[in-house]
């Protein structure tokens, strides 16, 4: 059986820009993408902690070290600069892959700098 699991999460990112006239997506500092293994053009789910909006888009790699979190296109209507968001990817895993799956989670500060990497291995099915 194939099931869908969280694969990576960027927790408490702050929106730095919003660009309605750009062609879709979210631009994220490439250093942050590397830390949680999110690739350019990968589908992401986003939750806005300020207004409860949940939506999906795809990723564009932003300038390294910039702290950039820019919602582009229609998604920009769902955020304000300064809003706190959570960005997640998911992976579809078979039963063998589920046991060793360990999501990557980066917790950010108010400047979108990584302050903690959380090992989600303790919360995986191998420990249930």
Swiss-Prot record:
Reported function: Catalyzes the pyruvoyl-dependent decarboxylation of aspartate to produce beta-alanine.
Enzyme class, broadest EC rank: lyase
Keyword Signal: no
SUPFAM superfamilies: ADC-like (SSF50692)
Cell compartment(s), UniProt: Cytoplasm
Name of the gene this protein is made from: panD
Its EC number(s): 4.1.1.11
Post-translational modification: Is synthesized initially as an inactive proenzyme, which is activated by self-cleavage at a specific serine bond to produce a beta-subunit with a hydroxyl group at its C-terminus and an alpha-subunit with a pyruvoyl group at its N-terminus.
Catalytic reaction list: L-aspartate + H(+) = beta-alanine + CO2
GO cellular component: cytosol
Pathway annotation from the record: Cofactor biosynthesis; (R)-pantothenate biosynthesis; beta-alanine from L-aspartate: step 1/1
Record-linked PANTHER family: ASPARTATE 1-DECARBOXYLASE
Names of the cofactor(s): pyruvate
Modified residues (Pyruvic acid (Ser)): 25
InterPro entries: Asp_de-COase-like_dom_sf (IPR009010), Asp_decarbox (IPR003190)
Similarity remark: Belongs to the PanD family.
Protein name as it appears in the record: Aspartate 1-decarboxylase
Entry keyword annotation includes Repressor: no
Signal peptide limits: none
HAMAP family linked: PanD (MF_00446)
GO terms, molecular function: aspartate 1-decarboxylase activity
UniProtKB keywords: Autocatalytic cleavage, Cytoplasm, Decarboxylase, Lyase, Pantothenate biosynthesis, Pyruvate, Schiff base, Zymogen
Active-site annotation: 25 (schiff-base intermediate with substrate), 58 (proton donor)
